[in-house]
Design a protein with these regions (language model features):
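Intrinsic-disorder-associated interaction segments
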Residues: 6-9, 13, 165-168, 194, ...
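Glycine-rich, Lys/Arg-enriched anion-binding loops that position phosphate/diphosphate groups
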Residues: 182-246
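N-terminal mitochondrial targeting presequence
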Residues: 2-25
């Protein structure tokens, strides 16, 4: 009996195609929102490296880049990413994403610094439908672009779930915005304050830096940096879960 390989091959291809198409029936996909005047990413693309790299500055660390790094590492793409702490532009250029250093804000190349003199972005300027006008730090920048994805991942829900928008707004208004304001030196009110708050997250993160008279080395600073990420990350996740269930 003559064996018709081509006939069998094409029958298998046809059967596979039907199953593939059937698997997508009933699926809902959220269309990209092009209504804003500026591009706000909701995902991230790596350079296809085996070990993704997140770049930030070395030296004294602050709450904004600590939280920015934590948020990025909660994305599936960056869960096992290595954090490179440097100001060397050659090394930063090798990173998949750079936060709080480099003097560039450009989401197209995943650069999220806010220190350049020209930077005046707020949540409202990037997403005009939102009311918040506090100048963004690297924490706010990363949150604006990737917060929805991280919330969906933490809550294990679909990216088009209405709950995400509610939590996204509440976490910024009642948590991230405070970090943005403190990092940028924006006072909580006009005029003289009756007292100072020194136990907020930004202060506690700052206190983890080695003091001026404390013996220090790269290993100790790295240990403190990781401890700070854990502290900031726990509070961020607590806020997400709190607003998701309130």
């Amino acid at each position: 009996q003559h064996f018709n390989f081509n006939s069998i091959f094409h029958r298998h291809i046809k059967l596979f195609s039907k199953k593939f198409i059937h698997s997508f029936k009933g699926k809902k996909f959220k269309p990209m929102d092009l209504s804003t005047s500026k591009r706000v990413c909701t995902g991230i693309t790596t350079n296809n490296k085996v070990e993704p790299k997140i770049g930030t500055h070395d030296g004294v660390f602050h709450c904004d880049e600590i939280l920015a790094c934590f948020i990025l590492k909660k994305l599936p793409h960056y869960y096992n990413a290595t954090i490179i702490r440097t100001r060397d532009e050659t090394k930063l250029a090798e990173c998949d994403v750079v936060v709080d250093v480099g003097g560039v804000y450009d989401p197209a190349i995943h650069r999220y610094d806010h220190h350049q003199r020209s930077f005046q972005e707020t949540f409202s300027s990037l997403v005009p439908s939102k009311p918040w006008t506090t100048r963004l730090s690297s924490a706010g920048l990363v949150y604006v672009h990737f917060g929805r994805n991280v919330i969906a991942h933490l809550l294990n829900i679909e990216s088009n779930d209405d709950l995400i928008d509610a939590v996204y707004d509440k976490v910024y208004e009642n948590f991230i915005q405070e970090i943005d304001g403190i990092d940028n030196g924006i006072g909580i009110c006009e005029g003289e304050q009756k007292y100072r708050i020194t136990t907020h997250l930004s202060a506690r993160i700052g206190n983890l830096n080695p003091s001026w008279n404390e013996p220090s080395n790269d290993a100790l600073i790295q240990q403190r940096f990781e401890r700070a990420m854990q502290l900031a990350g726990e509070e961020f996740q607590d806020k997400v879960f709190y607003y998701a269930h309130s």
